[in-house]
């Protein structure tokens, strides 16, 4: 999962962010959040060689927050198509295309709002206060979903969750990096391992439990949405408890905006934007697997496989399990083996990943054609599609994130992070808009329902991958390493 993601893929960024903050000259000064608040450390202890004391609070917070988000997301589209009520207490569910449209619009908002989170954090409030304030907003979003099962509760809840979840995304991982100085920077890989584990563990458990609560008549939507809300409240309290343990890097004001609009900054973003257009199409497909259209398809599958019985919303559990297996497999086995025959670089990995993503949708397209013909295919076929999709994620998402940071000027790391997340927003905005247009397209003779829907995305991804191969050959970038002069380099080096 992108718990991503996008937080889960940050080993490079954590180290870059640490060096970035420590390379800027700052005079230690106190931050007060109230008239009687104690003074907080504003720079890492460079002599500290053990784990920073605030790290356990950040890891606990992240695991609980990811539980809340992915638990809610795993049941969202099924709630809209099966359980949604009107103000009179009667069922008023959405059609599949309408539910998919709102689902992707919500995901698009979640990954658009990190831009504002980065601006608020870096320019005004700092990371700690930004995370605390927006986490409270996040909690109220879960409360609205749990307490009101009408469209009012749905849209109010999703709006608040998008603001809270999206706003804190660029802050949390940077806050981890802020805790480390030169004396303990060697512990970053270990911290990232626990950080990454907490994210995937939280998403795995919630994706398993929340569908059970939703489908059990003793509980239903109120408990299914209430459990993620409770975990978000716990996440907020845990983070607040660590306030005296954290290093609080002060906001730098809006001076970084000048760097953003400098010639070098605009040129770097312009170069990355060429790659990001293709990555946005990747996310347009990927997010259909995480509680979206693939979950709706799973409702029509034979959910018994290898002695196990799945709920439709639980099939997506395959992704976090597989990504944990694939990252070491790709890094230590597959990439070195391919590199001996065909030299790999960042853009080549991304290109291969785009083709693999298309292959996953070939499987989904075939499954849907069997369903449309009256069949009931085994869920094992969708699990095969998850294997291919997760392989493409390892090649595109992780590689693209690390590539972005090395291509970003040293003072623009946070903004480039927000720009990377914006590709997710663009991809989901496209998918959401397309779903809303399906009824109108039908009236004009264009059928994008059933197997034709997945056929469209399969061809879209294939065409995108082919064009990317040619465009990537002409990409020339500049690599920026903290503490060193920027180096002209081919993008793939």
Predicted feature residues:
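C-terminal ends and interior cores of transmembrane alpha-helices
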Residues: 136-150, 356-373
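Intracellular juxtamembrane helix-capping segments at the cytosolic ends
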Residues: 167-182, 395-408
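Hydrophobic core of transmembrane alpha-helices in multi-pass small-molecule transporters
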Residues: 152-168, 374-395
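Short amphipathic helix-loop junctions that connect adjacent transmembrane helices
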Residues: 74-98, 292-312
């Amino acid at each position: 999962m992108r718990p991503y993601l996008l937080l889960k893929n940050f080993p490079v960024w954590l180290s870059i962010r640490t060096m970035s903050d420590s390379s800027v000259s700052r005079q230690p000064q106190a931050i007060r959040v109230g008239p009687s608040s104690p003074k907080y450390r504003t720079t890492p202890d460079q002599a500290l060689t053990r784990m920073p004391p605030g790290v356990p609070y950040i890891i606990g917070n992240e695991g609980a927050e990811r539980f809340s988000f992915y638990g809610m997301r795993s049941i969202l589209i099924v709630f809209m198509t099966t359980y949604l009520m009107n103000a009179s207490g009667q069922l008023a569910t959405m059609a599949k295309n309408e539910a998919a449209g709102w689902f992707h619009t919500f995901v698009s908002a979640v990954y658009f709002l990190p831009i504002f989170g980065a601006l608020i954090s870096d320019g005004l409030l700092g990371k700690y206060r930004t995370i605390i304030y927006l986490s409270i907003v996040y909690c109220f979003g879960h409360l609205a979903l749990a307490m009101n099962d009408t469209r009012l509760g749905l849209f109010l809840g999703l709006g608040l969750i998008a603001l809270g979840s999206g706003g804190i995304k660029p802050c949390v991982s940077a806050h981890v990096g802020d805790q480390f100085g030169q004396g303990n920077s060697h512990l970053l890989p270990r911290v990232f391992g626990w950080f990454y584990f907490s994210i995937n563990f939280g998403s795995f458990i919630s994706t398993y439990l929340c569908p059970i609560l939703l489908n059990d008549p003793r509980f239903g939507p109120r408990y299914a949405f209430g459990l993620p809300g409770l975990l978000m409240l716990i996440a907020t309290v845990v983070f607040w408890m660590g306030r005296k343990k954290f290093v609080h890097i002060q906001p730098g004001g809006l001076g970084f905006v000048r760097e953003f609009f400098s010639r070098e900054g605009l040129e770097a973003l312009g170069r990355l934007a060429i790659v990001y257009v293709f990555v946005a199409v990747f996310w347009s497909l990927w997010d259909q697997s995480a509680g979206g259209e693939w979950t709706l398809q799973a409702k029509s599958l034979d959910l018994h496989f290898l002695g196990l019985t799945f709920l439709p919303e639980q099939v997506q559990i395959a992704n976090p399990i597989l990504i944990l297996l694939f990252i070491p497999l790709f890094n230590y086995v597959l990439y070195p083996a391919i590199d001996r025959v065909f030299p790999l670089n960042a853009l080549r990995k991304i290109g291969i990943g785009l083709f693999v993503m298309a292959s996953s949708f070939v499987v989904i397209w075939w499954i849907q054609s069997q369903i449309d013909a009256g069949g009931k295919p085994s869920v094992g076929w969708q699990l095969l599609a998850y294997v291919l999709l997760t392989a493409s994620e390892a090649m595109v998402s992780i590689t693209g994130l690390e590539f972005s940071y090395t291509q970003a000027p040293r003072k623009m790391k946070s903004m480039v992070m927000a720009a990377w997340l914006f590709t997710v927003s663009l991809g989901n905005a496209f998918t959401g808009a397309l779903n809303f247009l399906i009824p109108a397209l039908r009236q004009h003779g264009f059928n994008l329902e059933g197997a034709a829907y997945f056929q469209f995305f399969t061809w879209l991804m294939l065409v995108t991958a082919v064009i990317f191969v040619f465009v990537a050959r002409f990409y020339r970038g500049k690599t920026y390493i903290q503490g060193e002069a920027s180096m002209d380099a081919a993008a793939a080096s």
